[in-house]
Amino acid sequence: VYSGDASYIISENPNMDYFTPSQGTNNWYDAMVITRDCSETELAHQFINFMLNEESALSNTEEVGYTSPVKSVYETMITGEYEGVSSYIPDFENPNSEIFRYQEPKIKQKYAELWTKIKAE
């Protein structure tokens, strides 16, 4: 499951836990971007600013369980509802973990083939 789902599951069931193998995993990052061909850049900036507003960021974090980039929200959550929940607190200290990169053309092609197959089913 995704870490946000795991955070929710763990908060509802103390018998569940989140495990990161010592062999490593991928370091995950969520991001908002504005594409170069975006026709509504001002609106996109307004949306990003809205999502980074402390109240909105807290509400979003409480709803989806994902770690917030807003420091005050993160600190509120790790000392509150998600205190001690390992799926909420990212572990970037494991030297065996890595950032997955999918830039190779053969990988992009494979994703395109799989996506086409999924859409066809």
Locations of the language-model features?
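Short amphipathic alpha-helical segments
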Residues: 30-32
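Mature extracytoplasmic/periplasmic domains
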Residues: 26, 35-95
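Ligand-binding pocket segment of bilobal, Venus flytrap-like solute-binding proteins
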Residues: 1-21
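Conserved C-terminal helix/tail region of periplasmic/extracytoplasmic solute-binding proteins
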Residues: 92-121
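A generic helix-loop boundary/linker signal
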Residues: 21-24, 37, 101-105
